Amino acid sequence: KVLTYNVEDDADEQRRRLSAALRPFGRFPRDIAGKVIRCGPSGVGTLIERDAMGQITLTAAWEGLRALLTQHRPDIVILDPLVELHTAEENDNTALRLVIAHLRELAQEFRCALILVHHTRKGATAGDMDSIRGAGSLVGAARAAFTVTPMSEEEAEALAISGVQRRHFVRVDSVK
């Protein structure tokens, strides 16, 4: 069972993306009913905040996520995007380590895997661990990290894929 906690995409966009992901397998969302729980963007929010004293604190949204995990007991939780789920300084290694520590404790408590979706910096290079935006401790704390980049014109040409079709392909590189 998978729970997605998505603060960027509305329900229609999430539905479209799930349908698109299933299409190559000849499957439909109804085929996995009850196995994918989609949350957001309404009713979700910032999980971890930095208070006026600079301390990292857990929010009401954190408790809401815990309630969802208690109710659904997912095997995998996808948090998308990480930057929208906390107010810690993105380039502060110490603050990000605390954010990750809370998320790790949550995963351990509920015995689930966490997938944190995070943006790359502008001008990022495919397959480069340093392309991941913000503090290096984010990648350091990860068990595995991947970059996802659109197919380049050069790659499409080499594979004889038309420009129109190119947008349907991405490159996934393991960077850790």
Where are these regions (language model features)?
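Conserved inter-motif catalytic segment of the P-loop NTP-binding fold
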Residues: 2-90
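Phosphate-binding/switch region of NTP-binding enzymes
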Residues: 20, 76, 94-176
